[in-house]
Amino acid sequence: MVKIHTVGGYSEVGKNMTVVELEEDAFIFDIGFFLPAIVSMEERDKVMTEKRLKKVKAVPDDSVISGIKDKIRAQFIGHAHLDHVGAIPFMSDKYNAPIYATPFTCEVLDSLLLDNDIILDNKIFAVKPNTSFYVKGKNRKYKVDFINITHSTVQTVMIALHTPKGVVLYAN
């Protein structure tokens, strides 16, 4: 079984979040902001929390994957734009899973964490574009490729998740 959960970013520009669910494992691709909501919120509120962000619909509504939260094994980030990486400081902690991103995207994420005085328990791994690596599932390892692609920010990658059912490509 391969099930794709379109959590955010499919009916609007922003709040990008996709989850690929397999029998025993699941993987997050991007957790981003809806920027117009962030701008209006920053004009009113100085402190951002997940609850406030969800109230103004600035982050993905991940309640649709609450039943598979314990299956999340990794979080992959495709590039450094805020609509793909911006909500990680506020939402990633609830998933006991490491974060994988390119070095530039990791620097942007580190800045977001510092700006919001947030320390994540998740390990963050910088992976160079055009690199393959393995992530641990419940009973198997999965090969992942970070494939360099062209975009309006540096170190953008298409992510290839190799599963027993085939390769899932993510290039949102």
What residue spans do the PLM features occupy?
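Active-site-proximal beta-strand elements of phosphoester/diester hydrolases
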Residues: 3-8, 27-30, 142-149, 167-172
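Divalent metal-coordination and catalytic microenvironments
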Residues: 4, 20, 30, 79-80, ...
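Pre-active-site segment of Zn-dependent metallo-hydrolases
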Residues: 15, 25-76, 90, 115-120
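Metal-dependent phosphodiesterase/nuclease catalytic metal-binding core
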Residues: 19-24, 28, 156-172
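A short helix->loop->beta-strand "cap" motif at the edges of active sites that frequently abuts
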Residues: 25-26, 95-97
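Conserved P-loop/Walker A NTP-binding site and adjacent catalytic elements of P-loop NTPases
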Residues: 32-39, 78, 102-103, 109-112, ...
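Di-metal (Zn2+ and/or Mg2+/Mn2+) metal-binding site signature of metallo-dependent hydrolases
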Residues: 69-95, 103
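Metallo-beta-lactamase
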Residues: 104-156, 162-164
